[in-house]
């Protein structure tokens, strides 16, 4: 059922700083399980770095969901991955869809573009043929046990099951000690800094979900996890993250609902667009957002809205394909396995060509159920299965039964569900912040407000090149800014405001402004323009109309600056967010730019 504006969900998630030592293994030094996040190949300008932590929330009347993206640093041992999630109730766990994350991110990534025109200067202008001379060369930017079990000195184990690549247990106790002992007995390496924070959650009535990768699982098998529950409140606490978080950690929250979402107990910030380097298509984006959310009254606990609009922008064809069918693999000759994947659109692996897989889990399942013989290159093996027919391990293939079951659980069912979410929930909101450990003192809550306006992902400025070599850039909101020499992007002396507005957003109606720097910013901008004789005195303009260069933002692939998580703790840190419901309001600026009303 669709939710109404009176339905409420509070989603809270947290990661304790624990690593896996392995039950029958010699304990090793805990390794950092960070991650790399990069949306490559997005058409058009994409200057915004997309590394960081990502969570999708789905808000419903009777059932709610949180989708958690888990990415492990490829330079670490995947077996040393451990994760704790405090929850208000025992959820239903399932395999999540990485393509759902990929497509939601690609459809909503904020983009900054600039179109250049030239003043007519009395001589024929050379057509730049779409090349902007001011632009940079590229834009940057299983088996389960259900029910309570336990011993007198241990926690109550409410649930144990295998979920895709993960082994999951849900623990309940009123004290940290029994949970700590259970974790250590089951191969988790305890971090003492987690104890007081975990106790806070136990005192609040939370149960603790513990996740670790199943034995023999590799990094190729890692996938998102979905938690689904019939509850009005559940939790994803940010407080646990501070144990091992880095300064200015990126957090990106996506909400699928009926209307636009906004932060409840965190502030909402409109970024000063003069701080964005439009000429270089916002290569300074993260620094601008970091400074804006650290501004007066935002205090390091605020979000900007990067996109808000119809969820139909998401390409569902890349989330699930109707040709995907696990039954095709049951009883299949293993020599035909790759050909069948090709036919279903899940692979493109042919002799004399590199093999590519159109779902991130296909390759890992092939390695598990149809491994190449020792010493044989996997790409050569999978492209030439007929040649290696006599060397295939038919016992592992087992008539394709395990592969088919894996296809259903890890690829097909998550894909069907992901596609259904986009088609069921008409609105997508994307919010972003950076936050440091000393700021992680409360868990962010979100709600839906039907009064809030759409926020486009693409922001375009106009660059008017003057005959004297200077430029006038018109920002998306219509404000003009004089650029001496046509660049670089100047900083106005004394114009120190990174946030144009700091707001609180209620359940209904327009946001309430706490800080409004618009007048001060405008005053400094106008004074700057006048100091540079802009606008011109009457009669000083060129008598000819301007000529368009046809230039626009670079259309190369985005230079997404991916990076691996760092640190000495064997725990992939996830986003911790709490979520509520409400509705939508009028136009705002998002991600540092004025946006049009719809």
Regions found by a protein language model. Give the residues of each.
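Bacterial N-terminal signal peptides that target proteins for export
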Residues: 2-16, 564-569, 584-588
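Bacterial N-terminal signal peptides
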Residues: 12-24, 574-578
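Sec/Tat signal peptide C-region and signal peptidase I cleavage site
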Residues: 23-32
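Accessory, solvent-exposed terminal regions and/or long lumenal/extracellular loops of proteins
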Residues: 36-49, 190-541
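Surface-exposed, glycine/proline- and aromatic-rich loop segments on solvent-exposed faces
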Residues: 49-120, 179-205, 209
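A cross-kingdom signal targeting lumenal/periplasmic-facing segments of multi-pass membrane
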Residues: 91, 95-163, 360-362, 366-377, ...
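Long alpha-helical, hydrophobic tracts
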Residues: 129-221
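Ser/Thr-rich, Pro/Gly/Ala-heavy low-complexity intrinsically disordered linkers and tails
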Residues: 138-140, 144-151, 541-577, 585-597
